[in-house]
């Protein structure tokens, strides 16, 4: 479909000397270096992706400010999903200050790294999420399968919150686990209005990933979320631990090949425009 916006709804930039990326260690050699707009621009040009959503990779307000500065000087970055201390007494003030920047489109606590799986259900977090909703921001849920039942409980209390589940909730593809994830994903789709990102799956599938290994997971997401609630993202540069940018994009397009053009266009860009108000 000519003229349709193609959006990568999940990519990162970082600069190691900032010092706030605790998860990014030398053993992750392919991505243990700085990544910026100059690294991604040729990949976007090669693949015909016109714009991106830049997502936080450190649980600090300072990193979010850094990303907003990058967005201000990078034409292809249409929005930023940042971080704020949603359980802090001053959360509303922090969110209000960050939201003054027009590029801020959402916030993402790094739920997968928080030791207490019930953290998201704490009353101060609920108040923080009401602030997110009040400022018209999306909430990115970086969760694993074990978080999905709590996430369903959380969203029942926040029916108006625009929620995007990152990386298909990280199914354990390499281990061949499907059943519990599939049941909880179905419940999430049926009980909430959440969107889910078609991203990060090659990382979860391991070094011997293939389109066919991903297919049952993608088909399950499509069956229950449908093309109106599925959003493409690259998870670049993390994806390069398993596949190149163009390689993952081609795999995603292969997995979506059975859909009509309008449905593919929604997944490959229009849904991101809607949920992040790009």
Question: What does each model-found stretch correspond to?
Answer:
Residues 62-77, 159-165, 217-223, 248-255:
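Short, electropositive alpha-helical surface patch
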Residues 119-231:
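Catalytic pocket-lining loop regions of alpha/beta-barrel enzymes
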Residues 41, 65-69, 96, 152-153, ...:
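Active-site phosphate/pyrophosphate- and oxyanion-stabilizing loops and adjacent acidic/basic residues
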Residues 11, 57, 168, 235-236:
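Active-site metal-binding loops of divalent metal-dependent hydrolases
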Residues 59-60, 86-89, 114-118, 171-174, ...:
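Short, small-residue-enriched loops and turns at beta-alpha junctions
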Residues 1-135, 141, 188, 212:
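Mid-domain alpha/beta scaffold segments of enzyme catalytic cores
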Residues 2-7, 31-51, 220, 225-231, ...:
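Mid-to-C-terminal alpha-helical segments outside catalytic/metal-binding sites
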């Amino acid at each position: 479909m000519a003229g349709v916006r193609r959006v990568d709804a999940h990519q990162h930039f970082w600069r190691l000397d900032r010092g706030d990326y605790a998860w990014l260690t030398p053993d992750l050699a392919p991505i243990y270096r700085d990544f910026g707009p100059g690294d991604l621009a040729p990949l976007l040009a090669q693949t015909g992706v016109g714009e991106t959503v830049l997502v936080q990779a450190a649980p600090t307000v300072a990193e979010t400010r850094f990303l907003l500065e990058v967005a201000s000087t990078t034409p292809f970055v249409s929005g930023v999903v940042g971080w704020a201390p949603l359980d802090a007494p001053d959360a509303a003030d922090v969110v209000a200050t960050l939201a003054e920047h027009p590029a801020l489109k959402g916030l993402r606590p790094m739920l997968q790294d928080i030791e207490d799986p019930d953290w998201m259900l704490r009353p101060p977090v609920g108040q923080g999420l009401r602030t997110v909703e009040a400022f018209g921001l999306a909430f990115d849920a970086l969760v694993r399968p074990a978080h999905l039942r709590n996430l369903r409980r959380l969203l029942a209390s926040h029916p108006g919150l625009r929620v995007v589940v990152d990386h298909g909730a990280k199914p354990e593809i390499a281990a061949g686990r499907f059943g519990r994830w599939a049941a909880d994903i179905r419940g999430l789709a049926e009980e909430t209005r959440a969107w889910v990102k078609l991203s990060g799956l090659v990382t979860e599938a391991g070094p011997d990933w293939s389109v066919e290994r991903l297919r049952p997971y993608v088909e399950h997401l499509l069956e229950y979320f449908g093309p109106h609630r599925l959003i493409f993202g690259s998870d670049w540069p993390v994806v390069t631990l398993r596949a190149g940018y163009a390689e993952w994009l081609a795999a995603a397009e292969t997995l979506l090949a059975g859909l009509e053009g309008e449905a593919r266009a929604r997944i490959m860009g229009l849904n991101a425009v809607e949920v992040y108000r790009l």
